[in-house]
A protein has these predicted regions:
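Short, highly charged C-terminal tails/helix-capping segments
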Residues: 311-312
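Flavin (primarily FAD) cofactor-binding/catalytic cores of flavoenzymes
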Residues: 1-99, 106-302, 316-323
Length: 323
């Protein structure tokens, strides 16, 4: 198959096992690497389940596997749970955000003194892309290291009903959330012995579980991807990881940047471009990005650039709208 232009619209990449999960466990039925394929039968007979991660993926797994007498332990670096959506829409917040990560953090803290934090974060989300584009590489790294956990739990929220169910599980002891880092796992017959280091401590704690579920979410390090197409692109130099390793490096038009220059006719869209645009997973953001890319590809075809000389004269906005 030949094409004048190719757009990589792969969405979120499948999760990879976190450090601490050894090969023996990875190949065992006592471990679920991809929770999006998790079925209730996988947990049949399990009383104690370790969930690696504490975000929305963990919540989905815990609620779907919840049974009388079953206990869950959720382990994540910071032990933070997603916050909940409001039952009624809050008063909108409209003030602009500007500056580096520290400046924006101060502005958010000040804004939440007079407005519902949800409204503040909703407005911040719409400002995230231009803010990210204006930050230096050092500022982006600082955000990822220090502020991303807070961003994630406020940005990716629970429905009010799910929040009630999770807090009920916490209150009843069905669910325990721990802050720490998984250090090792050992298969022991029909159970798994796991060791983790609590946050701020050196000595590990051990526990025994009947099932371990990877709930760390979509793959966040492009070099770890087992997607054959991604591996081939990187191997042949058609593309390269972005400086933060979040996805593939692209220019402002979404073209992949190879070993030394943009690759004409090869584009990426969505989470693969997170290193360049950061907030690029919600439908409104994807729709806007798709429209921009469609217009660019159509214009390149009209002018004979990027090897796309014979593109049909279709309105790119109609393509994005599905008309």
């Amino acid at each position: 198959m030949q094409a004048e232009a190719v757009v990589l619209a792969l969405g979120n990449l499948e999760p990879a096992s976190p450090p601490g999960v050894d090969e023996a466990l990875r190949n065992s039925p006592l471990y679920v690497e991809n929770p999006w394929r998790l079925e209730a039968e996988a947990a049949e007979g399990a009383r104690d389940i370790l969930l690696i991660g504490a975000g929305l993926t963990m919540v989905d797994a815990a609620l779907s596997l919840r049974r009388p007498g079953r206990r869950f332990t959720a382990l994540s670096r910071h032990g933070l749970l997603p916050r909940a959506h409001a039952t009624v829409p809050p008063e909108p917040y409209v003030e602009a955000f500007a500056g580096g990560p520290s400046d924006v953090l101060k502005q958010v803290r000040q804004a939440t003194q007079t407005h519902d934090w949800r409204a503040v974060f909703d407005h911040l989300r719409h400002s995230a892309r231009p803010l990210w584009r204006s930050w230096t590489a050092v500022q982006r790294k600082r955000f990822l290291r220090h502020l991303r956990p807070l961003w994630d739990v406020h940005r990716h929220r629970l429905s009010p009903g799910s929040a009630r169910d999770i807090h009920s599980m916490l209150a009843s002891g069905e669910l325990t959330v721990l802050a720490g880092k998984l250090s090792e796992t050992t298969l022991d017959g029909r159970s798994v012995e796991a060791a983790w280091r609590p946050r701020g401590r050196r000595r590990a704690i051990r526990g025994r579980f009947d099932l371990v579920v990877n709930c760390t979410g979509p793959l966040g390090v492009i070099q770890q991807s087992r997607e054959p197409l991604i591996a081939d692109i990187l191997k042949k130099g058609y593309g390269r990881p972005d400086p933060l390793g979040l996805g593939l490096q692209v220019d402002g038009d979404g073209r992949l940047i190879g070993q030394d220059r943009p690759a004409d006719g090869l584009y990426a869209i969505g989470p693969l471009t997170r290193g360049a645009f950061w907030e690029i997973t919600a439908v409104p953001d994807l729709r806007a990005q798709a429209l921009d890319l469609a217009e660019h590809v159509a214009a390149a075809g009209a002018t004979g650039q990027s090897g796309a000389a014979d593109w049909p004269r279709t309105d790119p906005a109609a393509i994005v709208r599905g008309t």
